[in-house]
Amino acid sequence: MENKSLESSQTDLKLVAHPRAKSKVWKYFGFDTNAEGCILQWKKIYCRICMAQIAYSGNTSNLSYHLEKNHPEEFCEFVKSNTEQMREAFATAFSKLKPESSQQPGQDALAVKAGHGYDSKKQQELTAAVLGLICEGLYPASIVDEPTFKVLLKTADPRYELPSRKYISTKAIPEKYGAVREVILKELAEATWCGISTDMWRSENQNRAYVTLAAHFLGLGAPNCLSMGSRCLKTFEVPEENTAETITRVLYEVFIEWGISAKVFGATTNYGKDIVKACSLLDVAVHMPCLGHTFNAGIQQAFQLPKLGALLSRCRKLVEYFQQSAVAMYMLYEKQKQQNVAHCMLVSNRVSWWGSTLAMLQRLKEQQFVIAGVLVEDSNNHHLMLEASEWATIEGLVELLQPFKQVAEMLSASRYPTISMVKPLLHMLLNTTLNIKETDSKELSMAKEVIAKELSKTYQETPEIDMFLNVATFLDPRYKRLPFLSAFERQQVENRVVEEAKGLLDKVKDGGYRPAEDKIFPVPEEPPVKKLMRTSTPPPASVINNMLAEIFCQTGGVEDQEEWHAQVVEELSNFKSQKVLGLNEDPLKWWSDRLALFPLLPKVLQKYWCVTATRVAPERLFGSAANVVSAKRNRLAPAHVDEQVFLYENARSGAEAEPEDQDEGEWGLDQEQVFSLGDGVSGGFFGIRDSSFL
């Protein structure tokens, strides 16, 4: 009797799919609801076929697994229904494949039976496409064992034989790694100077910490055309103990392996003590703090001020209430309709990133009156209402953080080296956004003071970094006037440029410096005046003339140094007299068009602009592409992290931007979701089980 009543209660369940479901697997599963249609429990799901209860944690991997193990017929139906969805996910991988010429049915069967024509060519093309998907999409090699992936390829071409995971891991990926490595070795051999950057990240799935090392250089991508190059060199695991020693050893080995020991001029890092110590031990001249990391450090310090911290905590509780209460969510929607406000949910934030906090505060400010209307009618939650002074502080924080968001967006959209923009941006922020006004509240004034102190301490109170950034800015024809410096400071910058140019000329003369690019914009081997004298004078006709020439035409004395100095000063003066370039114009194109006019200054430019402003590409640091990359890296097996991240990063160099996730980025600047449901194709189809890493 008890079993019958249980069965009867289960069959009486009113199941509904997830309200934001995307995967077609929800056809077979649902949540239990009450009489009003509200979901009773979000962490329990029922199978519509066998009424089994399944735990739900935010993704659909266990749902498809339940179908595969218990309901094979429905699983096949589910796989077939998703074929088109899978086709779209892999469209890029197959876009380069040429359509096979049409054949008669008899001829087709004969070709399959004989094994020619198709196997040799088409098999290679499809295997190359699969390898491209794995490498450029950061998929683990175990994807070739996924049933749905096999179904996709069989649907695309039933004759194709998919290689094994072992072949992909031990042969195909290493061969592609070797080919790409040879190309990058040639690029670095031709580079005059290079900067490095270190991206420290953690794989949450494996609880391992990694460092991805990249090299950056300013070279000649085409004849008479300067271009910025960025190449990933290595990804290595760092232990919890002896981190600095490990990083130092690996960096040294990488410098030797890639032949850049004498070319590394600067390093851009998050300014962690371990990486800074490693760079110091390796005598890296410039330690450049990551601009994005510095922004976050200063803003997070401001958020930790007692009153601001308490306010942000109240804001998070308010958002959490609306996200977790179906009644409150419904009332919010109704109030938005009544007040003719666009329907949108409140935004939660991640405590560690300021961009998501800004998104939360902006949405609260937009919905201020709607929220107040809901809470007035909810007597049990009046304590969540914010006071007028708190709303004023929220408005002030939004106004304070908005320029930082605009700076982040500008850096992300920039197609040029960003190191020359650091000083102008800092000057703008320190003298406008962070300038304390009389109308500012005490909390807002303290926040501005804390952020300004962090920016100044990091960039302006270190003389070497300050001078480096000033020179990098001066060499940008958009900012060369340096209006934020005094006349004395500008003269110091110009003197540094002259010293750098003369130093490069001295290396040329000593034979210790001969970059490959000299064939494009050559540095003269001697002062122009003496070269003219030598070429215009006929060769000596006697031994006496040779002796006289040795006495009166010898080079390398004080006279030469003066002529070198005069040439550099003249070139610098010519550069200063050129028209200032527009802010939206390309500084690299400006220099490329004038390589013949300026034979020396581009050499200094290559040395200073190879150092980057951020430790990773700005569009990844500030944008939502960060989530895509992080999620993909997390699923890689430890043994393949180095090769696959290497191939992924170098495949994307100069390619289109990483497609953005729907969730917030590393900085939360693009966050529009209420919370991540993990309910998509990536969760249902490509959720890699733990056994995939074995």
UniProtKB/Swiss-Prot annotation:
Chain intervals for the UniProt region annotation (Required for interaction with human adenovirus early E1A protein): 315-694
Any one GO BP annotation for this protein: protein sumoylation
Zinc finger annotations (BED-type) as residue ranges: 20-78
PROSITE patterns: ZF_BED
Locations listed in the record: Nucleus, PML body; Nucleus
Annotated binding of Zn(2+), by residue: 47, 50, 66, 71
Ranges for region Required for nuclear localization and homodimerization: 571-651
One Pfam family recorded for the sequence: Dimer_Tnp_hAT
EC number: 2.3.2.-
Region (Required for DNA binding): 552-624
Alphabetically ordered keywords of this record: DNA-binding, Host-virus interaction, Metal-binding, Nucleus, Transcription, Transcription regulation, Transferase, Ubl conjugation, Ubl conjugation pathway, Zinc, Zinc-finger
PTMs per UniProt: Autosumoylated with SUMO1, SUMO2, and SUMO3.
Superkingdom, taxonomy of origin: Eukaryota
UniProt subunit comment: Homodimer and homomultimer. Homodimerization is necessary for protein nuclear localization and DNA binding. Interacts with KPNB1; required for nuclear import of ZBED1/hDREF. Interacts with CHD3/Mi2-alpha. Interacts with SUMO1. Interacts with UBE2I/UBC9. (Microbial infection) Interacts (via C-terminus) with human adenovirus early E1A protein (via C-terminus); the interaction is direct.
Protein name: E3 SUMO-protein ligase ZBED1
Organism: Homo sapiens
Lineage: Eukaryota, Metazoa, Chordata, Craniata, Vertebrata
